[in-house]
UniProtKB/Swiss-Prot annotation:
The keyword Coiled coil applies. The keyword Coiled coil applies. Residues 209-247 form a coiled coil. The lineage of its organism: Eukaryota, Metazoa, Chordata, Craniata, Vertebrata. Residues 62-84, 144-256 are annotated as: Disordered. Residues 161-188, 218-227 have a biased composition (Basic and acidic residues). Keywords: Coiled coil. This is Lysine-rich coiled-coil protein 1. Residues 64-79 have a biased composition (Polar residues).
Length: 256
């Protein structure tokens, strides 16, 4: 059945429109809502719970279908109107109050969950419809993907990973060669420093030894000169101590 989205100023206008449509279809609509409502309110009270959550979720539809609905007794129509959310339009509030009349009577006699009208179903299903549209769009996009395209993409990704792995393997030897060359340069520099230090040490040692040898040689030369002088002096003294016989002998033989 198609529901009209035409806004009504009152419930009476909506009811008259509904009766016309039913009569045009050859049906006899039930118009005993007010009498049934009065009888039901006399027998028991009803208190309608409104949900103030967003997206116009007016009723809790998560109850099992077989559960019996019982309502508190002390509730008036003014209290019900006071609990209507302020963010609903005026014509929606009117339709909500009129809907509560029908639902009160139906619940009182049948004790079954009351089906919601089109506007309330739209309010309750607002968030779910958005989620379902997004889910369907994602599923359709996933289903429209060509298997060959997806296989090609997977192959390209795999090839890219392999190439990245090769590049990393090529970069490792470069780093290793660079590190080994740096280590070689460092070792070479250290060896040069060791050789230089050793040469300097040897030079110092050679200089010290040479200086020592010079001192020793000089000391030996001085001592030898002293000994020569001493010998000459001794010889001279011995020559002066010759006897007269030796001097005469020298004169007679040598002629001096």
């Amino acid at each position: 059945m198609k529901h009209s989205n035409k806004p009504y100023d009152s419930f009476q206008d909506e009811l008259e429109d509904y009766i016309k449509v039913q009569k045009a279809r050859g049906l006899e609509p039930k118009t005993c809502f007010r009498r049934m409502r009065g009888e039901y309110l006399e027998s028991c009270g009803y208190r309608e719970e409104f949900d103030s959550r967003p997206r116009y979720r007016m009723f809790d539809q998560r109850l099992p279908s077989g559960t019996n609905h019982s309502y508190p007794r002390s509730c008036s129509s003014s209290q019900t109107e006071d609990r209507v959310p302020q963010w609903l339009p005026a014509h929606d509030k009117i339709r909500l109050n009129s809907l509560s009349y029908c639902q009160f009577t139906r619940d009182g006699f049948s004790e079954k969950p009351v089906p919601l009208n089109l506007s309330q179903q739209e309010y309750n299903c607002g968030s779910y419809s958005v989620e379902s549209v997004v889910h369907k769009r994602l599923c359709s996009e996933h289903s429209t993907i060509d298997p060959q395209v997806s296989h090609r993409q997977m192959h390209q990704k795999r090839k890219k990973h392999v190439e990245e792995g090769r590049e990393k393997q090529e970069e490792r030897p470069k780093h290793e060669r660079k590190r080994s060359s740096e280590e070689m340069d460092l070792n070479k520099h250290r060896s040069i420093q060791r050789k230089k230090t050793k040469a300097e040490t040897e030079t110092v040692q050679d200089g010290t030894e040479k200086l020592k040898n010079r001192k020793e040689k000089k000391t030996r030369d001085v001592s030898s000169k002293k000994e020569d002088r001493k010998r000459r002096k001794e010889k001279k003294e011995q020559g002066e101590e010759r006897t007269e016989e030796e001097m005469l002998w020298d004169q007679s033989i040598l002629g001096f």
